[in-house]
Amino acid sequence: MFFFLQLLVPIISVFQSKKHYYSTFIRCSISNRRPEYVPSKISDPKYVRIFDTTLRDGEQSPGATMTTKEKLDVARQLAKLGVDIIEAGFPASSEADFESVKLIAEEIGNNTDENGFVPVICGLSRCNKSDIDKAWEAVKYAKKPRVHTFIATSEIHMKYKLKMSREQVVEKARSMVAYARSLGCEDVEFSPEDAGRSDREFLYDILGEVIKAGATTLNIPDTVGYTVPSEFGQLITDIKANTPGIENVIISTHCQNDLGLSTANTLAGACAGARQLEVTINGIGERAGNASLEEVVMALKCRGEQVLGGLYTGINTQHIVPSSKMVEEYSGLQVQPHKAIVGANAFAHESGIHQDGMLKHKDTYEIISPDDVGLSRSNEAGIVLGKLSGRHALKSKMLELGYDIDGKELEDLFWRFKSVAEKKKKITDDDLIALMSDEVLQPNVYWKLGDVQIMCGSLGLSTATVKLINTDGQEHIACSVGTGPVDAAYKAVDLIVKVPITLLEYSMNAVTEGIDAIASTRVSICSIDRHTIMNGSTGQTIHRTFSGTGADMDVVISSVRAYIGALNKMLSYEKLVSRYSKPEDSVVV
């Protein structure tokens, strides 16, 4: 980290004075200022737009496939978080993705909050008419629609992937931006893919041409995470100084994390003049991921006034942790404990010296309050639930935790809660969140777990008998043997559902401490015979993967619930795809 700060010093030095740099620590402040949205300009030069691409770039992570319902839930949460632009997907990649983007544009893109805020809804497209038509058709229903189009500009991409000359690439970019504007889209973003490795003079030329064609935002991607902060900051500075018409558009950054520099590069870009930052929740994305929303936003919030030129965002940071947990749950990508801001250990202090300092004054070792990001310090405050608690108390507690549930969802959760409360003396917030995830935040249910019976030991193979219930209420029972109780149970499930499934990942952790802790299981599956897609950048064939989670005090039941959850997500995806295309159709992403 010290190395990163050294790299940032030349860039941020213009903003800081010795007085600020060595000033006493000041608690992070919350800013609610948000300038009126105009596509190509921002009235306050210190305001930075946050462009979230969790639903597009983030979902390209292996195992991160989300259902339409899950995407809508995430989009709603992003709107609560206050992100300026939601990149809802890549409409041309499949009809299923097109429908998801369209639904988000229709619902989230028209839901104005009490402050008059409604996010921009953006769809990605390659530089061709059919992609742009699809993107516009999907997002045009939003109050603030945007089309984001891209083409590669580095020599290696133009020569080997596009097989196009510089002149052809410039003309394609110019004409397609103009075409997007001709459809009636007044907000067009252009990205020169692999800008970090592109020739500077060529970059200035193509950016100048798309500005003349009507682009309102120019996104500068470090597509392979190759640059370092001083280098990326200089790139933004050079683009500002040498691109004709640059004063009439917004400069954006999109930094990948291949060298672990995405957050540092993003901040360097902001200090150099970028006023839109492209990020994802938890930093998820292809390969090593993207710049993390929570890291970028909290860095600006905590250090913006002192060393980052007063830059600020419109993010409601108290929704960061709920957003992180939702994306973690739906994507199946577990946040590592030491992850900055949202990791389980982010606010934990084990060292005796640190604990002593914290007890005397929290600011000794804590630069961010857990409350700033929506994390309660303790489960002890507020309503305490037990086996005698009723539905009203449960509903109130879940509302306190950020979950507004009613009707069947509340009823289903209540009976799971009562079942656990009979066996467990103390129900913690983490227990409730795990049960909520397992009982309510699940995809459409095609198969539901009825019963599981296990026989195992050291004398022979484990045996599992599993009862599943389908959507018609019919019970199906199968028995199988395996190398362990979980393996036997999974094989019994396979005998019932008759779908070829490959288990890719399996993990389990205790939600809380103690012998009576709830076990939370995560699995990732794929079907080798189907769901084959092609990566548009690499041309590689990829098997779409599906994740599931389960929670129970019994580790085998928790494991089976997770497996069935992943299976239901896969079947939901199959049903959605079958509405629009033949099962054998491949998808380009």
Curated annotation (Swiss-Prot):
| Record domain Pyruvate carboxyltransferase: where | 48-321
| InterPro entries membership | 2-IPM_HCS-like, 2-isopropylmalate_synth_dimer, AIPM/Hcit_synth_CS, Aldolase_TIM, LeuA/HCS_post-cat, LeuA_allosteric_dom_sf, LeuA_bact_synth, PYR_CT
Q: Name one GO biological process term.
A: L-leucine biosynthetic process
Q: What is its EC number?
A: 2.3.3.13
Q: In which pathway does it act?
A: Amino-acid biosynthesis; L-leucine biosynthesis; L-leucine from 3-methyl-2-oxobutanoate: step 1/4
Binding-site list for a divalent metal cation: D57, H254, N290
Naming one, the record's GO cellular component terms include: chloroplast
Q: What class of enzyme is it?
A: transferase
> What would you give as a GO molecular function for this chain, any one?
metal ion binding
User: Which reaction does this chain catalyze?
Assistant: 3-methyl-2-oxobutanoate + acetyl-CoA + H2O = (2S)-2-isopropylmalate + CoA + H(+)
Q: Which Pfam families match?
A: HCS_D2, HMGL-like, LeuA_dimer
Superkingdom to which the source organism belongs:
Eukaryota
Q: Spell out the PANTHER family in the cross-references.
A: 2-ISOPROPYLMALATE SYNTHASE, HOMOCITRATE SYNTHASE-RELATED
Q: How does it assemble?
A: Homodimer.
Q: Which NCBIfam families match?
A: leuA_bact, PRK00915.1-3
**What's this protein's name?**
2-isopropylmalate synthase A
Q: Please report the organism this UniProt entry assigns to the protein.
A: Solanum pennellii
> From which lineage does this chain's organism come?
Eukaryota, Viridiplantae, Streptophyta, Embryophyta, Tracheophyta
